[in-house]
Amino acid sequence: MESFSVFVNNVDSLVWSMVLVVLCLGVGLYLSIRLKFPQIRLMKEMIHLLMDKEESESGITPFQAFATTVGARVGMGNIAGVASAIFYGGPGSVFWMWMIAAIGAASAFVESALGQAYKVKNPDGEFSGGPAYYIEKGLKCKPYAILFAIVAFLGPGFLMPGVQINSLVTVFEEAFSVNKILVGAICCVILGIVVYGSIKRIAQIAELLAPAMCAVYILAAVIILGLNITKLPGILKMIIQSAFGVHALLGGIVGSAVSWGVKRGIYSNEAGMGCGAIVSAAAECSHPAKQGLIQSFSIYVDTLFIGTATAMIVLLTGTFDVADAAGNLLISQTGGLESGIKWTQHALISTFGTWSGKALAIIIVLFVFTSMTGYCYQAESNIRYLTGNSKKAVAIARAVFLAASFLGAIVNADAVWAMGDIGYGLMAWANIIAIALLAPKAVEILRDYEKQKKSSKNPVFDPAKFGIKDETGAWNRKKDS
């Protein structure tokens, strides 16, 4: 097992080189400039669209797509992932997580709008789309599209699920002293019952759970903030100084702060990976820009709200350590407590008492549940693309997904996180380049949306106007929405 951990960590380092970090930041900034920072200037429109009740017969509603995506994004990357970023990159990694969220929201807009624009209607009446579709139809490069679809199955379908289950069984073992394998088995049985339902069923579950789990977790962070408000200025100062290498103790790991902040930021919000595009393509709406804006807002919910909540919980309570690249502790405050989910758990216990550790375990169930159902849909969507909607292939893909999930209860945390990083990294490599190349099309889509809005119209998308062939009738709407 040790040799396996060494192998996956070496692959992880290769995939997540500084080149990918710069690419994610650079493309996000490029798209923000090309689109004139829609993630800032159209914030009011995002909230309006989120509240709009748009009915759907063929797909899921825009809010369900938002809830499903938030459910998939808000997972262990926001809790255990943020904590590990602080351990390896210092508090400064939090600043770079904020930065990748701020500019990554533009990447989220582009991929989700493109996912909608190039979506197809399946024989069962539901929609499919995402990077594989806009790469094939937009860039007209079938081999590239197939490559992405393979990577996008391996990521959510095999490499990434173990992270969620590993964190879940760890927190349950800590809170209730129960066997990890037993918890993992029960979790996989429940997942099996759910994932064999349709996307509408997944969307309905996510719509109910996602807002509730976010609200409870943020409330806990707000209470901790209130109890430690006098420490806040010092913590914010440490974050900024560490981010730019001017902190007395942490100045030598500024590179780690940037790389781990971007790495865990993308792990938590998935901006630029294409995951959000896959789910948003399943929504039925009158214009692709609507889903683009809604998915941009989900980045804020994920990183700026949930990710920041975790950072404040561990930093304000002093439940964190920081290590350099060689593993030497630069800051040691936890008494050797393993970084990750246990930091958050012990921070809550130190504030609210032992019951809060058990409460966190229950909240983690919700985070993991919605993340895993989102992963399953993303993997399944790409299998459908590769096999032409083969029911047998989908059934096999679901079985692989459940088996990979159970491995998370068996394999050590270090190896599981490295596998997850590889999955996210490969998807980022494949998708970031594609959305940069398709930026002009995204600019046209947003301009069309804003032009119609200025004419006091409910924007309606005409794919022919953009040179997009709607061969399956995905945009043949029976009614305006």
Identify the residue ranges that each predicted region occupies.
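Transmembrane helix-loop junctions in multi-pass membrane proteins
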Residues: 3-4, 35-39, 78-82, 91, ...
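Selective recognition of specific alpha-helical transmembrane segments in multi-pass small-molecule
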Residues: 103-111, 185-199, 210-230, 263-266, ...
